[in-house]
Amino acid sequence: MGITVNGPIPADTIFNQNIDGHYDVCIAMYHDQGHIPIKVHDWKKSVSINLGLPFVRTSVDHGTAFDISGKGIADHISMMESIKVAVSIVSDGVLP
């Protein structure tokens, strides 16, 4: 079993191809390079995954939102997506 790696591929091309299902994973060289197209595509359902750790780590793709903390107005969708991705990785061993 091997890993097929392609690239480098321009960001304006690779992210659309990844969203269309041409790739299982798209790796960005730095934080903002990866977050911009993902957040534009689907802000609420974007999830960060740290690969290469000895445990599963997912997180929401937004900040802490201290300005709305405790007001009962936060949207839960990002957190639910992060949990669903983590559960899928643990139970199936693959990304959803």
Place the predicted regions along the sequence by residue.
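Glycine-rich phosphate/nucleotide-binding loop
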Residues: M1-P96
